[in-house]
Amino acid sequence: MADHQASIPAQSSHQPEWQRSPRRGLQIIATLGLGAVVLAGCTQPDGGESAAGGTSSAVESSTAESSAAEQTEQLTFEKQQVAELDVEANPVPAAAAKLPEGFDLQSHRFGRGEWIESSREGLENSLEMGVSTLEFDIELSADGVPVVWHDTEIDAEKCQDTEPATNDDPKFPYVGKLVHELTFEQLSALNCNKNLDDFPDAAPQDDNRLLQLSEVFEIAADYPDVHFNIETKLEPEAREDTASPQEFVDAIMDEVEDADVADRTMIQSFDWASLPLVRERDAEIPLVLLWDETTWESGSAWIGDVDYDAVDGDIVEAAQQLGVQVLSPGHAVPYGQTPRDDDYHPVATPELISKAHKAGMAVVPWTVNDEDTMREQIAAGVDGFITDYPSTGQAVLKEK
């Protein structure tokens, strides 16, 4: 994903009920005056306690039992009516028509909060549970193989060396090297099975080898309804660290076409310069505009030919210029805040969603991990969200 600062039986072609029926609603945040808190308190999926916020109708108690009860109480959010998504208003209606139907639950890096990130196990479990979209990143190896991995550099916190791919390999050890410096054979010698402090509950694995894009399509072949949201993991502020945007687009699209999944594939990027290259390759593939407060600003290297000042910071106007189908913002400013925080300011507000829908664009924020934020964003009217916890997202979507 989208994180700028994450033998299976054949699947039925029938979509889960929660996926067929998107929920619309009203975000709550007292400072914005858009809704009301009914109850307060919830534990985040990573086990950490949420910051206190909102109003509780319960009388304060000093007992441990009352404190525990308050922590498990739930925020609720009233519906907000937003404009319907007008596909025909999109700059490329045929591309907008290919977006997933219903609410788009996207498994970020194959659900890295539940399984080791970008792992085969996470991929298979995400498919089996019935997510609508697999969200993942692509790096290019030295020999041009599109590799399913988020980081430009092999991080010792995630991966460990096993043995060199060849005797006396001068590149060994591989940890600490750029992905683009190593061949896929060398990358395959890495064991990227480490649990991260931020995701302590991810199921441990003895062995996790990096996947290539073609393997994702092979593993997902029995799931004809699943979509793929593929990020070109480019670094416009350090172009020398990766392959070129054109090389990324060509390598990814070659695999997409070989697997015959173009009708279920979206291409996303923070590096907006890569998106027109995708459109040149495929006139009808959906494009996803990624941004957060660090990339969408005047003079940013991330926004390609878009002039921030000329559009007066209007993200929808910028998206129209690029001909995209999905707006995908970091879910809040500051990023990571939740409705329990006093300074929670969601980016995907009902106002932005309505404006985007009138322009023919869906809104799918990242990375939405706690239940409160999931409920608030569903109520605000988002068309989906990207999450490290797809099981949590699925459970919240069933609350009707």
Language model features: what each stretch is:
Residues 2-8, 14-30, 42-60, 65-400:
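Phosphate-group recognition and catalysis centered on beta-loop-alpha active-site segments
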Residues 33-35:
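Classical Sec-dependent N-terminal signal peptides that target proteins to the secretory pathway
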